């Protein structure tokens, strides 16, 4: 074993989900597959009200729109936020196929969404992305953003890691 391997922190452990959370996270993962099929990065998001009403769904549309902010989470929030009040969103859950980036975590904070469930974590995503500078992220956890929030944002993940990882295989430049 190399010295580097012994200094790396362990990958986050998978979190078990109940039937409802699993169903909606799988819906977000299916949207990630659609995003990839359309030439985008493979990410999907679903926002669900406390009563189970679907408020919004979206996939990453960077590739097809050229909009660097067209991440799945921000796109879903752009649909849900004007149509539903802050109280509804505070009780809602955003399901994301991947751990939200710092931009998306900020949008989740500003939208008042109170709960996030995500699939593949940022550490595992970085392994798919490789070392190319044009594919790097800010390396700031969404939990860091959520922990700085004056209102609570529950964060559950990583979950369904193998399912959430599948659409990333071969999707990133070597």
Regions found by a protein language model. Name each.
Residues 62, 96, 120:
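Residues that line or immediately flank small-molecule/substrate-binding pockets and catalytic motifs
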Residues 1-35, 107-174:
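Zinc-dependent deaminase
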Residues 20, 41-44:
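Short loop/turn microsegments at loop-to-beta-strand junctions
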């Amino acid at each position: 074993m190399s010295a580097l391997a012994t200094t790396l922190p362990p990958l986050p452990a998978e979190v078990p989900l109940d039937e409802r959370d699993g169903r909606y996270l799988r819906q977000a993962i299916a949207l990630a597959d659609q995003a990839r099929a359309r030439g985008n990065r493979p990410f999907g998001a679903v926002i669900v009200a406390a009563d189970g009403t679907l408020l919004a769904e979206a996939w990453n549309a960077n590739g097809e729109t050229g909009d660097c902010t067209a991440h799945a989470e921000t796109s879903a929030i752009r649909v849900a936020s004007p149509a539903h009040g802050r109280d509804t969103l505070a009780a809602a859950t955003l399901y994301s196929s991947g751990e939200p980036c710092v931009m998306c975590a900020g949008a989740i904070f500003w939208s008042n969404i109170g709960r996030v469930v995500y699939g593949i974590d940022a550490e595992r995503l970085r392994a798919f992305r490789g070392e190319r500078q044009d594919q790097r992220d800010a390396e700031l956890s969404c939990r860091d953003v959520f922990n700085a929030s004056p209102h609570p944002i529950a964060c559950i993940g990583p979950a369904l890691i193998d399912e959430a990882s599948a659409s990333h295989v071969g999707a990133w430049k070597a």
